[in-house]
A protein has these predicted regions:
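Class I S-adenosyl-L-methionine-dependent methyltransferase catalytic core
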Residues: 1-179
């Protein structure tokens, strides 16, 4: 698999909303394991929060400094579901998001690049982490920014950690038309 530059000129603090279909892909897992979900990275108007609220989840969405938080925004939060910032440091910011989320809640659901679990420096989050439970590979590419003549170039997956998980992680494939 190769990566190519999209040609999109990023702006400081620009927002790339997670499309509705992407969140719908992870609904079956969330419906089995979660009731009260926190999206700490996309703000109250996030599309993730909209989908989850529409499906009956109790959702809190914030966009403050997640890594500085030492407690949950509400005591009954049982999961975090978000599209974390990756940062320009090779994904280290996303790693810190995952680490912090695992300290706060029993179920963590993160939308990440498909090869995020491939790095040997991240084995502590995957291979060596008993709570890593499931990966849902998106068969359709996410269109983050509408641009004429541009095709999306990145592949993504939902990564799920569950403190109650026992055994090897599982993998599933899903796409926009299938949800």
């Amino acid at each position: 698999m190769s990566k190519r530059h999209s040609g999109y000129q990023r702006q400081r603090d620009d927002v790339n909303e997670t499309p509705f279909w992407v969140t719908r892909v992870v609904l079956p897992y969330l419906q089995q394991h979660c009731l009260h979900v926190w999206d700490p990275a996309n703000g109250p108007a996030s599309k993730i929060a909209q989908v989850l609220s529409g499906e009956g989840f109790d959702v809190i969405a914030t966009s403050d400094d997640f890594l500085a938080r030492t407690s949950l925004p509400h005591a009954n939060i049982d999961s975090i579901c978000t599209d974390p910032p990756y940062g320009r440091d090779g994904g280290r910011l996303a790693c810190r998001f995952i680490e912090h989320a695992l300290e706060l809640v029993p179920v963590v659901v993160m939308l990440l690049r498909i090869d995020f679990d491939s790095g040997k420096t991240r084995t502590y989050l995957f291979l060596d982490c008993g709570s890593f439970a499931h990966k849902i590979v998106l068969l359709d590419r996410i269109v983050w920014f509408e641009r004429e003549g541009a095709d999306p170039s990145g592949n993504h997956a939902w990564y799920i950690w569950n403190s109650k998980h026992n055994g090897s992680p599982s993998i599933e494939y899903a796409g926009g038309e299938r949800t």
